């Protein structure tokens, strides 16, 4: 169990294929289920706690190792697809038939896999800070910051409230240690479109979206700027989507204003199932 990747009580589940998944569980008294995936749950935990006021929330750690069934042509694991399959297998094992899915940045990848392969289990899908990229990349600021040695520069670009947010982020990284990084991150974590064989297939599925999709971005997020044209195009082609850009917000919005992240999810879910015809 990767208990160090969760702040507070951590649990684990052994899937039928023998893989162990680490997860947290909050809001057990609520009827509706929400699943959210992430590499770790420390600075994102306040969002989980807020979501748990309305939903029975499972936060599932997206793993970097172990066996997998979703493979690349060369036999290596396609981690983008495997993260999605893990969430699906988790839900099946837990007896969860349908659920809301919320992902932020890399955490959206399992949601897009479910959207593509098992939309029947999704009530709706909050895809926050990331959309499939159908129009290419205009810059590479975010991953250049991540790979650089200037932590203060990266944090200043990633959050508004550096003075309060930086200590929390550094505490998180200390708890996680070397397990925070993997070659899977730059290859799969910011590229939902890689779940499809072609961009044409991806666009077709967006045009015929089988479940409500809620996009949210921060106007000052470097990753938003890196894929600006693609993000705006996703808004145009995703059938019936909810699309929000929050002025002034940056990438680590869960540190700056976790309440608004949760509130945007609540607003989207409330509107997603109303009949506007």
What does each of the following model-derived ranges do?
Residues 112, 116, 122-153:
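Flexible "cap/lid" loop of the alpha/beta hydrolase fold
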Residues 103-107, 111:
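Gly/Ala-rich beta-loop-alpha elbow adjacent to hydrolase catalytic centers
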Residues 136-137, 152-209:
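Conserved alpha/beta-hydrolase catalytic His-Asp/Glu region
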Residues 58-102:
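Active-site loop/oxyanion-hole signature of alpha/beta-hydrolase fold enzymes
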Residues 214-249:
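Conserved loop-alpha-helix segment in the C-terminal half of the alpha/beta-hydrolase fold
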Residues 15-70:
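Conserved HGGG/HGGXW glycine-rich cap/lid loop of the alpha/beta-hydrolase fold
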Residues 61-66, 131, 249-250:
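Short beta-to-alpha linker loops that shape the active-site pocket of alpha/beta-hydrolase fold enzymes
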Residues 240-277:
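Catalytic active-site module of serine/aspartate enzymes centered on a nucleophile-bearing elbow/loop
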């Amino acid at each position: 169990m990767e208990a160090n990747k969760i702040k507070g009580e951590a649990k684990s589940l052994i899937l039928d294929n023998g893989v162990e998944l680490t997860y947290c569980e909050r809001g057990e008294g609520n009827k509706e289920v929400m699943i959210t995936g992430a590499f770790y749950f420390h600075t994102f935990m306040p969002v989980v706690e807020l979501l748990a006021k309305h939903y029975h929330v499972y936060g599932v750690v997206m793993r970097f190792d172990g066996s997998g069934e979703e493979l690349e042509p060369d036999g290596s694991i396609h981690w983008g697809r495997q993260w999605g399959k893990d969430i699906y297998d988790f839900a099946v094992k837990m007896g969860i038939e349908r659920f809301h899915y919320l992902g932020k940045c890399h955490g959206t990848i399992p949601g897009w896999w479910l959207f593509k392969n098992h939309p029947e289990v999704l009530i709706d899908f909050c895809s926050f800070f990331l959309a499939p990229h159908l129009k290419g990349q205009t810059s590479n600021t975010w991953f250049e910051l991540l790979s650089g040695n200037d932590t203060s520069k990266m944090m200043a670009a990633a959050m508004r409230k550096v003075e309060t947010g930086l200590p929390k982020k550094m505490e998180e990284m200390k708890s996680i240690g070397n397990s925070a990084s993997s070659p899977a991150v730059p290859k799969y974590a910011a590229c939902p479109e890689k779940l499809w064989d072609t961009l044409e297939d991806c666009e077709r599925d967006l045009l015929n979206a089988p479940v409500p999709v809620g996009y949210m971005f921060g106007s000052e997020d470097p990753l938003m700027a890196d894929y600006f044209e693609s993000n705006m195009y996703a808004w145009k082609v995703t059938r019936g989507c909810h699309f929000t850009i929050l002025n002034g917000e940056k990438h680590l919005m869960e540190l700056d204003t976790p309440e608004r992240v949760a509130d945007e999810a609540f607003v989207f879910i409330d509107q997603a199932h109303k009949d506007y015809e």
